């Protein structure tokens, strides 16, 4: 039996700080308020490798580097970095692997790291 990703869960201190950012960043996602602790955003159309993202409200703020992060792809890394900065993300660094692989490390408005590549 194989497992599949049901949803990705991101801890947050304030739903209203991170959810508007992630909804804009991901595009055609809709919000589903589960309760005070959990809010999910999910693609309007399910499938195509776009799992729902659940935000779990936690009392503590982020204090260290994420042990797991999202690797997101767009048509232009440079354009996506600028777009996401305009939405409230922070650019952390650009990384390369060899001559042909590069990505940008970024953080959402609460400091949760993610990467952007082409």
Question: What is each model feature region?
Answer:
Residues 17-27:
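K/E-rich alpha-helical interaction surfaces of small helical-bundle regulatory domains
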Residues 23-24, 82-87:
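Short amphipathic alpha-helices in soluble, non-transmembrane regions
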Residues 27-28, 58:
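Short beta-turn/strand-loop junction motif enriched in small, turn-promoting residues
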């Amino acid at each position: 039996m194989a497992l599949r990703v049901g949803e990705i869960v991101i801890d947050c201190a304030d739903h209203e700080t991170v959810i508007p950012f992630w909804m804009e960043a991901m595009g055609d996602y809709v919000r589903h308020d589960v309760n005070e602790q959990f809010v999910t955003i999910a693609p309007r159309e399910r499938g195509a490798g776009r799992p729902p993202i659940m935000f779990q409200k936690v009392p503590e703020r982020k204090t260290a580097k994420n042990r797991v992060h999202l690797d997101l792809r767009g048509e232009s890394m440079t354009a996506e970095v600028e777009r996401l900065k305009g939405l409230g993300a922070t650019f952390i660094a650009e990384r390369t692997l060899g001559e042909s692989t590069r990505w940008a490390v970024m953080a959402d408005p609460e400091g949760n790291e993610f990467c952007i590549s082409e």
